[in-house]
Amino acid sequence: MRLFGLILAGGEGRRMGGTDKASLTLGGRLLVTWVAERLGPQVEELAISANGDPARFAGLGLPVLRDEHPQGPLSGVLAGLRWAAAAGADALVTAPVDTPFVPGDLAPRLWLAGEGACAVAEAGGRVHPACGLWPVAVAEDLAAWLAAGEARVMGFAARHGAARAGFPDENAFLNLNAPEDLARAESLLRKDA
Ligand SMILES: Nc1nc2c(ncn2[C@@H]2O[C@H](COP(=O)(O)OP(=O)(O)OP(=O)(O)O)[C@@H](O)[C@H]2O)c(=O)[nH]1
Ligand SMILES: [Mg+2]
């Protein structure tokens, strides 16, 4: 089984005041670095899904994949699936750049839950579909789904009967959408220290 990984960082961060969330720091480290360090060891190859100037990620040494048509996170998933398929991977594991505490066993648990088919993460009764596993075989169906104007990750997961992989720690999926979420993540870090 060849699993590739993708950090979703193609959003505009409007709730964060229009900041590129990848460039925010938590505990003195870039958010994109947090996610790269957690997801990278779980996959064979890792890339970043982002629009705008790719030079801002040069320090990470990872491929940067642009959306063909930015239409939400699924546009990034499609670019990632095409990249993974071209390199002979079986599936892509995605995690958003604003989820710094993403579990170190995300990929294997998603893989086990879905037995290689689509799977999404769940913790504390909430589903986190941007933390998901997508077989390369769904790429063209995703392209058609996006072309039909659909954009919801949860909707696409449901369309493929995605399995749910349960995780014990809700904080692992803490999503930094607004400045107060970043403050909460900083306070969790201080508690752990
Ligand atoms: N490739 C790609 N990723 C996206 C797109 N829109 C959102 N994302 C990513 O999907 C994840 C979840 O999106 P949000 O939490 O809404 O982030 P966002 O869109 O940057 O923030 P808001 O503008 O406040 O909604 C984040 O990691 C985003 O970077 C897009 O059009 N293309
Ligand atoms: Mg958004």
Curated annotation (Swiss-Prot):
Residues at which GTP binds: L8, A9, G10, K21, D67, D98
GO cellular component: cytoplasm
Subcellular location: Cytoplasm
Annotated SUPFAM superfamilies: Nucleotide-diphospho-sugar transferases
Record's catalysed reaction(s): Mo-molybdopterin + GTP + H(+) = Mo-molybdopterin guanine dinucleotide + diphosphate
One family name in Pfam for this protein: NTP_transf_3
Class of the enzyme per the UniProt entry, highest EC level: transferase
UniProt KW Metal-binding keyword: yes
Presence of the UniProt keyword Metal-binding in the record: yes
Chief location category: cytoplasm
GO biological process terms held by the UniProt record: bis(molybdopterin guanine dinucleotide)molybdenum biosynthetic process
InterPro entries (alphabetical): MobA-like_NTP_Trfase, Molybde_CF_guanTrfase, Nucleotide-diphossugar_trans
EC numbers, comma separated: 2.7.7.77
Binding partners and assembly: Monomer.
Domain remarks: The N-terminal domain determines nucleotide recognition and specific binding, while the C-terminal domain determines the specific binding to the target protein.
Function: Transfers a GMP moiety from GTP to Mo-molybdopterin (Mo-MPT) cofactor (Moco or molybdenum cofactor) to form Mo-molybdopterin guanine dinucleotide (Mo-MGD) cofactor.
Descriptive protein name: Molybdenum cofactor guanylyltransferase
Protein source organism: Cereibacter sphaeroides (strain ATCC 17029 / ATH 2.4.9) (Rhodobacter sphaeroides)
